[in-house]
């Protein structure tokens, strides 16, 4: 499949004669309904297509890093991290690898149905037209799950569609990055087919001072393909059909550390833009994940397999229906309903003796949410107000943990958990006041929630000598928050936004240390000496105070951008987790900074971005700290003929040691070292 996708990507370098009607009148957009006016009251940042296409890495997670306070659980990206660590969050609501920010693509939730992480290699940058990041919870308009905020990805629409686009670049460590797309436009619609492929021999994740004979480079190979067709089916109505497939294979730098992901998505959205606006969406997602795990001895001379997660099938399906009744000038109302149903299980071989497994585990279940929502905006003179409410019904069903002995088939763990259900009421209110020309005051209050993932509920796991037990009794997480800030636009093309906020997330899910090996512990079995026993638990709360600044300026051919976030997250815990009270959640830096400059001229275009991440704790007990890091990425584009440009890119220009993990033995894993790319782009 990989070779086929690569051939498709490179085929984008040939002309597409079928696009001769590209100048015809386009009456469809490929978009959803218009943005809500009440969004003016929120902390909102928009990333345009120009920036999406011109990052140093050409990867979505690098583009999202422009938004200070956006974070994944680990600092490493989707070329070397284990996929399960790539949940996404905002505003210091961290300490957990599941996503606490809601990520949607054209209205479809994108978190993995089983584990809540994000399959970043499935999002080729060339397919995206715009990214909207709304910080703060309570965004019930897009569904449940927006604790920390909402990240909306929009596919390329009619305006940005081009007959031919393609790029190919060769990089450090035998890396290859290729994308391509073909587009066809007609008066009644458009179609786009695209593919992307990336591979590399990888770097050695363990830093040189800690390496042993067992350590080796961590290669990766990733591919995706996408088909999107948009057709007018009535004078004011269009149908949008999308299908995507991806594969992802990575190794973590030792034997028995490979993990793979694959998935297929299909979605149908119908949008009506008549007097009564409306849209209907239906989608289905299938996923599978595999991962091997190894124990490394203290001298790092041997790797011994400890677990083979050989099959993790998961399915998500859902839909939404929304109407926008005509209520007159200054009033916008959206009413709707949605549902998302998830199922999945992990199948694992564990307890290896003489290199062979002797036990089998199956763990999984089903979860679902169904909700009603209303979102209203009022524009009256200098005041814009927003009021949103959402009522959800949730269910957790068919939960199980089954463990058997391979030799006899005899079960030794048979746990079937009681079904649970409940309701959640959430909402948001906000106000924006135009106090003067170019000066807007903003405030908002909100409440959001998230259902635990199947992974958190039912799957125990091990990382090296440490073992973490699942918890089928986890409660949903709930956040309450308040924002206040302003947006200043002193001149055309200049914008500065400042926001202060407070969030309290009740029933915070965290991996809580309960004991140390050697010993036998509930839910995981034996933990060897030097290993820790943890369990997923609901802490009392996580409180975060913070503030953020976003600024941009367009000065002729030069554009400046900057984003800063400072947070003070504090755990509130009692009972078995009382030792965590007053500590900071793991993997949560207090300060984030991103700043960049872009130049677009006749002879060349260039971009440079600097990012700083403050130190953060590796563990829940705040005993080990990852050092602060500053990285610089850059890009240069030089046109050679019309539609063809040469490109040079560099990631981590000064080869900063970006620490991604720190073991109890002091072994440091790093994120991406300096990586240089040289290639070409075409666009017709």
Enumerate the language-model features and the residues they cover.
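Short acidic/polar hinge/loop motifs at secondary-structure boundaries
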Residues: 108-135, 217
């Amino acid at each position: 499949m990989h070779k086929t996708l690569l051939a498709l990507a490179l085929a984008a370098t040939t002309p597409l004669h079928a696009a001769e009607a590209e100048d015809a009148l386009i009456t469809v957009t490929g978009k959803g309904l218009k943005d809500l006016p009440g969004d003016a009251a929120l902390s909102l940042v928009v990333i345009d297509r120009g920036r999406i296409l011109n990052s140093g890495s050409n990867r979505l997670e690098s583009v999202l890093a422009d938004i200070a306070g956006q974070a994944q659980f680990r600092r490493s990206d989707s070329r070397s991290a284990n996929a399960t660590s790539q949940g996404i969050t905002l505003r210091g609501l961290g300490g957990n690898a599941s996503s606490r920010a809601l990520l949607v693509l054209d209205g479809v939730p994108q978190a993995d149905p089983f584990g809540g992480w994000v399959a970043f290699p499935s999002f080729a940058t060339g397919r995206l037209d715009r990214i909207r990041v709304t910080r703060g919870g309570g965004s019930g308009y897009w569904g449940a799950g927006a604790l920390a905020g909402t990240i909306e990805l929009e596919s390329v629409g009619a305006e940005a569609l081009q007959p031919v686009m393609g790029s190919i670049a060769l990089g450090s460590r035998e890396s290859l990055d290729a994308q391509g797309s073909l587009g066809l436009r007609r008066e009644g619609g458009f179609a786009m087919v695209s593919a992307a492929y990336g591979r590399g021999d990888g770097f050695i994740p363990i830093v040189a001072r800690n390496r042993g004979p067992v350590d080796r480079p961590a290669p990766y190979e990733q591919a995706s393909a996408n088909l999107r067709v948009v057709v007018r089916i009535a004078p004011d109505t269009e149908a949008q059909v999308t299908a995507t497939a991806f594969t992802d294979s990575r190794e973590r730098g030792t034997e028995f550390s490979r993990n793979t992901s694959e998935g297929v998505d299909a979605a149908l959205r119908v949008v009506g833009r008549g007097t009564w606006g409306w849209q209907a969406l239906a989608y289905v997602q299938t996923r599978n994940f595999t991962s091997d795990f190894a124990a490394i001895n203290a001298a790092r001379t041997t790797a011994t397999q400890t677990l083979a997660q050989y099959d993790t099938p998961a399915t998500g399906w859902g839909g939404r229906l929304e109407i926008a009744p005509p209520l007159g000038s200054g009033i916008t109302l959206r009413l709707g309903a949605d549902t998302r149903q998830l199922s999945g299980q992990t199948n694992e071989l564990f307890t290896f003796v003489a290199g062979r497994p002797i036990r089998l585990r199956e763990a999984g279940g089903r979860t679902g949410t169904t909700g009603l929502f209303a979102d209203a905006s009022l524009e009256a003179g200098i005041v814009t107000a927003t009021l949103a409410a959402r009522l959800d019904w949730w269910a957790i069903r068919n939960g199980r943990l089954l463990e058997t002995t391979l030799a006899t088939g005899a079960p030794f763990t048979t746990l079937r958990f009681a079904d649970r259900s409940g309701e959640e009421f959430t909402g948001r209110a906000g106000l924006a006041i135009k106090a003067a020309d170019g000066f807007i005051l903003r405030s908002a209050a909100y409440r959001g929630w998230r259902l635990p993932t199947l992974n958190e509920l039912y799957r125990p796991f091990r990382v090296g000598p440490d073992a973490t037990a699942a918890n089928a009794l986890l409660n949903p997480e709930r956040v309450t928050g308040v924002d206040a800030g302003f947006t200043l636009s002193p001149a055309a093309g200049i914008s500065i936004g400042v926001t202060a906020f407070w969030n309290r997330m009740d029933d915070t899910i965290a991996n809580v240390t309960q004991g140390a090996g050697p010993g036998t512990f509930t839910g995981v079995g034996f933990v060897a000496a030097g290993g820790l026993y943890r369990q997923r638990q609901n802490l009392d709360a996580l409180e975060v105070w913070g503030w953020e600044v976003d600024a941009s300026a367009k000065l002729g051919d030069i554009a400046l951008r900057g984003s800063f976030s400072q947070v003070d997250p504090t755990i509130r815990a009692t009972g078995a987790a009382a030792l965590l009270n007053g500590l900071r959640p793991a993997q949560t830096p207090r300060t984030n900074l991103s700043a960049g400059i872009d130049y677009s001229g006749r002879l060349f275009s260039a971009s440079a971005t600097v990012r700083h991440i403050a130190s953060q704790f590796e563990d829940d007990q705040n005993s080990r700290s990852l050092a602060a890091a500053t990285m610089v990425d850059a890009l240069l584009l030089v046109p050679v003929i019309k539609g063809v440009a040469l490109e040079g890119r560099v990631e981590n220009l000064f080869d900063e040691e970006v620490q991604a993990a720190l073991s109890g033995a002091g072994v440091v894993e790093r994120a991406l070292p300096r990586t240089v790319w040289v290639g070409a782009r075409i666009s017709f």
